[in-house]
Amino acid sequence: MDSAREPTQGSLDAAGFWQVWQRFDVEEKGYIEEKELDAFFYHMLTKLGVDDAVKEENVQKMKQQFMAPHDVSKDGCIQMKELAGMFLSEDENFLLLFRQETPLDSSVEFMRIWRKYDADSSGFISAAELCNFLRDLFLHHKKAISEAKLEEYTGTMMKIFDKNKDGRLDLNDLARILALQENFLLQFKMDACSSEERKRDFEKIFAHYDVSKTGALEGPEVDGFVKDMMELVQPSIRGVDLDKFREILLRHCDVNKDGKIQKSELALCLGLKINP
């Protein structure tokens, strides 16, 4: 394995690896199939600028070196982290893989992170704000990093996740970075249920977003609920759109004007009668 890494390490960053990986893992499942390995190595060597005359020979060498220590699962799937280790330094590897190790399953937690790092409430994460996020991320994982490297990795993350190349990240970009799981509300069919079923579903929904268990949604709990509600009808939303809809929801639902949405207030908004 070391011999496979020597000529490539330092020649490729996480963004370069990601460009090749995406050709094969379009749906971002985190793995490719064993039958795709030859083509993957071929594209990777092309990215590294290896001469065509020796490319095919090197593909077979790399495949042998990779397969020797790896026990490919019975379903023939090869995880991204197994291949990334061949080409990337430890830190570059971390940038690519931390999102797979700790995916977020809560829009409430996601919005807490969004509000923290969108420090100027612009509705976007700037490069400087992303840099702060990465600094905290490395500290959390007890990894020492210089400011110069931090700036370099911020640029790498922008290359990977800034889809429209405008130099800033929107809600959807950060959701991809944090590997936010499927919208919690997708499992409910509110319009196709009886009154009792709707009440039962409402209880589950409110309990999910009332993370603090106070009987009211506030702060990122409101944000998380708004985000998931909006994405039921508009899959790609911006931070500024979320803020507008949040204001509308509070205007309609926050009857006592305390800046929170009580359980009874949300039920009333949704046309439900619940037991006090």
Swiss-Prot record:
Q: Where does Ca(2+) 2 bind?
A: D118, D120, S122, E129
Pfam families per UniProt: EF-hand_5, EF-hand_7
Would you tell me the Gene Ontology cellular component terms? Answer: cytosol; dendrite; extracellular region; nucleus; synapse; terminal bouton; transport vesicle membrane
- Please name the GO terms that the record assigns under molecular function: calcium ion binding
For Ca(2+) 5, which residues are the binding ones? D254, N256, D258, K260, E265
Membrane topology recorded in Swiss-Prot or TrEMBL: Peripheral membrane protein
What domain of life does the UniProt record list for this protein's source? Eukaryota
Where is this gene product found?
Cytoplasm; Secreted; Cytoplasmic vesicle, Secretory vesicle membrane
PROSITE patterns in the cross-refs? EF_HAND_1 (PS00018), EF_HAND_2 (PS50222)
Question: Would I find Membrane among this entry's keywords?
Answer: yes
Q: Where does Ca(2+) 4 bind?
A: D210, S212, T214, E221
The entry's Ca(2+) 1-binding residues are D71, S73, D75, C77, E82
Classification via InterPro entries = Calbindin_Ca-bind, EF-hand-dom_pair, EF_Hand_1_Ca_BS, EF_hand_dom, EFh_SCGN
EF-hand domain ranges (all copies):
12-47, 71-93, 105-140, 149-184, 197-232, 240-276
SMART domains membership: EFh
Decide whether keyword Protein biosynthesis is in the record: no
Chief subcellular location equals cytoplasm
Give binding positions for Ca(2+) 3: D162, N164, D166, R168, D173
Q: Which UniProt keywords apply?
A: Calcium, Cytoplasm, Cytoplasmic vesicle, Membrane, Metal-binding, Repeat, Secreted
PANTHER family membership: CALBINDIN, SECRETAGOGIN
Q: What is this protein called?
A: Secretagogin
Q: What is the organism field in this record? A: Bos taurus
